[in-house]
Amino acid sequence: MRTLHTLLVPCLLLVFQTVCAEDENSCGQCHEVDPVQFAESPHGDIACLDCHVGADDRRHKRGLDPVECAGCHAEIAEEQIISVHGPKGRQRMSDLELPSCSGCHGEIHVMTLTTEPSSPVHASRQGETCGVCHGSGQPAPPGVHTIRPIEAYTASVHASAVADGQHGAACSDCHSTHSPLPASNPRSRVHHSNVTATCGACHTAITAQFEQSIHGLAAANGVGDSPVCTDCHGEHRILAVGADGSPVSATNIPIRVCGPCHSNVRLNEKYGLAMDQVPSYEDSFHGLAARGGVQRVANCASCHGVHFILPSSDPDSYIHPENLAATCGKCHAGAGSRFKIGPVHVLADTTPNIVAHWIRVIYI
């Protein structure tokens, strides 16, 4: 009897394993899945029944419960569910409007790794994938006010770099992969208080300068009016500095970047800033030349700096009295102490310095 038992148990195990294997193979009798493609996919070593729970009955019903990726990807699922794409993060969207795992990553049986260019979520294809919902002609979800972000991104230096196979920011680099949040959420990567750190992940040297500047320190201390990267460079349509249409091009800086804040009466009164900085520049020989389209003429950044802007009282400031000769000397070779003869931002009817007044009159 013991001998029979010893022989019977292995036989039963063999039969059970064979039946299971047949069940797995039998899926292909009804479901057209390329076994070669699936075997090469990231999920190639997973059995059908690992995902399709309840399909073990050979006569299983049609319309099985949807596959739950969270069974294996629990941490990612927790991030996604509270994101703007999750049911808790976007209460006003129906479940049908919410992006699914396969909606972004592709059909699971032929899915490829995110590092592969063929993956829908590879950096080079994120614009296309995200554009299914956020592209031109698509109605923006309730509460989303950004117009055509994908079209704007496609024209940017970031998209050009990605297209050339270089390292460039794609959608997920700024908005995160599985947990994008509204820009109004303090935990969002693109919230005003986090923009510097988000851009700093790639632009480390520039960020280190900005964080020490008057603008960076103010932003870090919660001053929402203080500009961060996107306020000057834009959000999705970030262009090269010298490109036509770039807000930070030489001719646009005074008008489109510095001017809107430093000519704003509310901001100047709130923070005790001088009211005449912008109009006095516009009426100067530098300002008139810039308005005339001259590229090689001093603008705000030429004198005050770009990212490392400091008060004139700071010894490291480009416009500190002891540094003016060097600052002006970048354009005016041989500039010496005479370049400190008077204030720069002066209006014709207010300047108390007769020498500066006549220099201004002669040049204009």
Kindly label every feature range from the protein language model.
Residues 6-15:
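Bacterial N-terminal signal peptides
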Residues 18-364:
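Short sequence/structural segments immediately N-terminal
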Residues 1-5:
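Positively charged n-region of N-terminal signal peptides that target proteins for export
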